[in-house]
Amino acid sequence: MTASARQFERILYVEDDPDIRAVAELALVDVGGFVALLCESGQRALEEIDRFQPDLVLLDVMMPGMDGPETLQALQQRAGGLSVPVVFMTARLQPSEIQEYEELGAIGVIPKPFDPMTLAEQIRRLVAEQ
């Protein structure tokens, strides 16, 4: 395994929809070979991030309570901030929305619905472009 592959093996995915979480788990773990922790809310991600120590955070944009952008801001405001890349997953893909995600610090956006067979490849490509 190369250093690059090791660098991004742990993904924290935040998604409120249990069906999408289940498909994403298959895509990330079984197809992609990542170690993944899936959280149902931004609040849960805040509780788990230090214990899990992800190499990348994958965030749904539209969630009840704390949405994806609010979750990212909360993660950034923690003691020590957020030192790993963030990718948003969303169906909200207007140019102004994508610009907002990038201004918040995301390295990219993966459109929903996503293809479980290519999700890991999309993530690796975004990381490689950084």
Regions found by a protein language model. Give the residues of each.
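Non-catalytic signal-transmission and effector/linker regions of two-component phosphorelay proteins
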Residues: 1-12, 117-130
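Two-component/phosphorelay signaling modules centered on CheY-like receiver
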Residues: 18-37
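Conserved acidic carboxylate
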Residues: 15
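Acidic, metal-coordinating helix/loop segments flanking the phosphotransfer/catalytic sites
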Residues: 38-56
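A Lys-centered signature of the CheY-like receiver
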Residues: 112
